[in-house]
Amino acid sequence: MNAHHLRKQLRQQRLRLSKRHRNRAAYQARRGLNRLQHPALTGKNVKIGIFADAFGEMPTQPLMDWARHRGYSIYLPVVTGKHQPLVFIEFTQKTWRQSRLPKHPLGMRQPEKGKMLNVAALDVLFMPLVAADKIGNRMGMGGGYYDRTLAKAKSKPLKIGWAYDFQLVEKLNANPWDITLDALITPSKLWLFRRYLVSKE
């Protein structure tokens, strides 16, 4: 199956899920967060990039609640232009619920103002995806925002995918410019793609 048809099929499959199924999957996946060990998650003033789900992705509210409980600073990606890298604006207590955020013309919710960082300043970045494979290749929505943003970064955060189990496929045909994941968290498993990551059982 080519990339276009795979992307279309998996996006449709996500959209068919009930709200109850989505929320249950997200809370099951949250358990994988507690098994992930990395220095980026244990330092002081940890800055984490988290996307606001808008296109049928596994809900990120449990992920944000986890980060808040751990005392991490949360930053949401913001699109500033079609061919521009993403910037990240702090998601504060005043704008905690995603439903209160303004909606971008592309469909996702994002803050309009706040403390802004580029991706190199983040310690960890949770990335949306349509599909990932068992060696960490990632297929996004097709806009290339994350690939462009990370390609230009002088340093890169720990890159973690957040997705349903059915979004994991055996192998993707990766392009040279595609940014790979360091780890993937699904409802049933924590996948580690880099040797320096450790799973705490």
Feature locations, PLM:
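Conserved phosphate- and dinucleotide-binding cores of soluble alpha/beta proteins
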Residues: 83-201
